[in-house]
Curated annotation (Swiss-Prot):
Substrate binds at residues 102, 128-130, 187-188, 192, 262, 289, 447, 453. The active site is at residues 184, 191. It comes from Lactococcus lactis subsp. cremoris (strain MG1363). Pfam families: 6PGD, NAD_binding_2. This is 6-phosphogluconate dehydrogenase, decarboxylating.
Length: 472
């Protein structure tokens, strides 16, 4: 007998917490896990909640009111396909499957098309905020059939994080098929960029200025009170003050400098390459993680490859402020690249992505939540056809005032032999984007020389080829 309003498949921490989040809003939630003992564990732990414990998929599906609203919180990839395959014979036309996993958007597009043939609605939903966000309120990026989203929107709007600025829920319809998971993918790419920029700032403060963890922590705390106010700056200041619970000193100094990844940053860069969109800062942040994993080689190289030694004797306070400005400037470059990629993808896949709304739903609940996202929303509210954020008046003003600081910081780091790939990439992207003329004319001449790839001229229309092998 149907008794549940919503169902969640997958009782790992994200699935469990999302189920509890939905239940806390007054809904009865059916729960299922392939391993029954896991479902039973969650049920017994929360017997005071309106959870329906089910042992089989048949029992799970049968417990749900129609149209059934089922959220899949299982491992992305083959596990998701297997779960859908098992569910499909049990569902009725009009039922709604929601994939809340970290799914690659082409998989979501494929599943949406396949399930549409069976009359089953499919909503690929990017969920950001980690396990805490899942429980208390994540940022959610759903994409799929609009009429299906309308049936789950009341629940999503209740469980999503609420922006502190205006209390609006951090969820909105992104567009058809894979739009939601694409937006989440770019969110993750921007997250890579933000984290690497913060890491480089930390390295500059520590390596060049010789500041202690306590001093750097205080700097990040101050930065978080201004235009850099964000979740990642907030947790950075927390990380820097934590002591090692297994010995002396700070825990950050005991953590091996090898950064892991789950591949979502790579997906963002791969898609940018496929679309022909310049995404240098985010891509450099992916490569920075990769080179960090070459620890043994880096140790060997450090003993044989020479570099400059800089004994800094300047005004530390002045440099700290320049690093702050460089960080904000570079953050803007990262978001400008990310939103330019969203625009290109929206055109390519016919999604009509709501750019200003995307920035709005990232204001709370998600990893990249930041105060300056409102400036992005304002920019698209003023001009929905804005080609690049750098052309908006607010960002024009910031880049005009802060670019000198970035150039100084990059110069200082190069002189000190301190790697700052994303800071360097930021100013290079800015200079490339603002250049009326680039040396690509020479590249096109070379291509025409060795491969007869032709070229266009600046003085007249048409496609041309030069006879390079004829002597002057």
């Amino acid at each position: 007998m149907a008794q549940a309003n919503f169902g969640v498949v997958g009782m790992a921490v994200m699935g469990k917490n999302l189920a509890l989040n939905v239940e806390s809003r007054g809904y009865t939630v059916a729960i299922y896990n392939r391993t029954t003992s896991k479902t039973e564990e969650v049920y017994k732990e929360h017997q005071d909640k309106n959870l329906v414990f089910t042992k089989t998929l048949e029992e799970f599906v049968g417990s749900l009111e129609k149209p059934r609203r089922i959220m899949l919180m299982v491992q992305a990839g083959a596990a998701t396909d297997a779960t859908i395959k098992s569910l499909l014979p049990l569902l009725d036309i009009g039922d709604i499957l929601i994939d809340g996993g970290n799914t690659h958007f082409p998989d979501t597009m494929r599943r949406n098309a396949e399930l549409a043939d069976s009359g089953i609605n499919f909503i690929g939903t990017g969920v950001s905020g980690g396990e805490k966000g899942a429980l208390l309120g994540p940022s959610m990026m759903p994409g799929g059939q609009k009429e299906a989203y309308d049936l789950v929107a009341p629940i999503f709007e209740q469980i999503a994080a609420k922006a502190p600025q205006d209390g609006k829920p951090c969820v909105a319809y992104m567009g058809a098929n894979g739009a939601g998971h694409y937006v989440k993918m770019v969110h993750n790419g921007i997250e890579y960029g933000d984290m690497q920029l913060i890491a480089e700032s930390y390295d500059l403060l520590k390596r060049i200025l010789g500041l202690s963890n306590a001093e750097i922590q205080a700097i990040f705390e101050e930065w978080n009170e201004g235009e850099l106010d964000s979740y990642l700056i907030e947790i950075t200041k927390e990380v820097l003050k934590r002591k090692d619970d297994e010995g002396e000193g700070y825990i950050v100094d005991k953590i091996l400098d090898k950064a892991g990844n789950k591949g979502t940053g790579k997906w963002t860069s791969e898609s940018a390459l496929d679309l022909g969109v310049p995404l240098p800062l985010i891509t450099e942040s992916v490569f920075a993680r990769y080179i960090s994993t070459y620890k043994d080689e880096r140790v060997k190289a450090s003993k044989v490859l020479s570099g400059p030694a800089l004994d800094f004797s300047g005004d530390k306070k002045e440099v700290i402020e320049k690093i702050r400005k460089a960080l904000y400037f570079s953050k803007i470059m990262s978001y400008a690249q990310g939103f330019a990629q969203l625009r290109k993808a929206s055109e390519e896949f016919d999604w009509d992505l709501p750019y200003g709304t995307i920035a709005q739903i990232w204001r709370a609940g998600c990893i990249i939540r930041a105060e300056f996202l409102q400036n992005i929303t304002d920019a698209f509210d003023k001009d929905s056809e804005l080609e690049n954020l750098l052309l908006d008046d607010y960002f024009v003003d910031i880049t005009k005032r802060y670019q000198e600081a970035v150039r100084d910081v990059v110069s200082l780091a190069v002189q000190a032999g301190t790697p700052i790939p994303t800071f360097t990439s930021a100013i290079s992207y800015y200079d490339s984007y603002r250049s009326e003329n680039l040396p690509a004319n020479l590249i096109q001449a070379q291509r025409d020389y060795f491969g007869a790839h032709t070229y266009e001229r600046t003085d007249k229309a048409g496609i041309f080829h030069y006879d390079w092998y004829t002597e002057d």
